[in-house]
């Protein structure tokens, strides 16, 4: 596949409005800055509509919810839909509690999302599949060998692109599905690594035309996975060093290295 959106992110520095969780705010902002995007971290209901007038992308991440956040997310999501700003949903722990289930269902009913990014448990919940997650972690379930089909089914259900992240990532628009075979076992050991991926996807959508969101999302996930591989080189269990290396790699990676390292496979039914 061709890689063209990474350079556009660096050239255009898209302003991304992140309504994300308090655990990952700093890590997400630093990752976006390293990549070349411009994060705007605000969850004030009184200003989120105005922000959509100049933002290029919106991330909604439900990791640490409160009622004010929910209000801000609904207002921002609807405003983004009106102005044509792409919206990414990260339904952290979607099936873990009744409160989260109801909030996610409300968001999906009232906001049009360009991309939904989640782990197997979260995407499985959206598909109605019997996955057993542990808190906000992925867990295992009946469709553990059919992740490609799982991503595809949710993409069809909600008419959007789905990024199912894990040991390998599956990206689907409901018709086409790619498997990204890059990555490292160290990424899940860093709090917020999945949440930052959602933010990176949103940045790539911010420089992409709507008809190419699938390619932009696939490229974002590939950049992320390859950066993780490069950051892990020479490390075993030094997770703190890995986290710093990973931010560095997001800033250093370029299309030539990406094309050389990427292992992206088209899935066939």
Swiss-Prot record:
Coiled coil: none annotated. Keywords: ATP-binding, Kinase, Magnesium, Metal-binding, Nucleotide-binding, Thiamine biosynthesis, Transferase. HAMAP family: Thz_kinase. ATP binds at residues 117, 165. Substrate binds at residues 41, 192. Its cofactor is Mg(2+). Pfam families: HK. InterPro entries: Hyethyz_kinase, Ribokinase-like. It catalyses: 5-(2-hydroxyethyl)-4-methylthiazole + ATP = 4-methyl-5-(2-phosphooxyethyl)-thiazole + ADP + H(+). Pathway: Cofactor biosynthesis; thiamine diphosphate biosynthesis; 4-methyl-5-(2-phosphoethyl)-thiazole from 5-(2-hydroxyethyl)-4-methylthiazole: step 1/1. Its EC number is 2.7.1.50. This is Hydroxyethylthiazole kinase. Catalyzes the phosphorylation of the hydroxyl group of 4-methyl-5-beta-hydroxyethylthiazole (THZ). One of its GO terms (biological process) is thiamine biosynthetic process. Belongs to the Thz kinase family. One of its GO terms (molecular function) is hydroxyethylthiazole kinase activity.
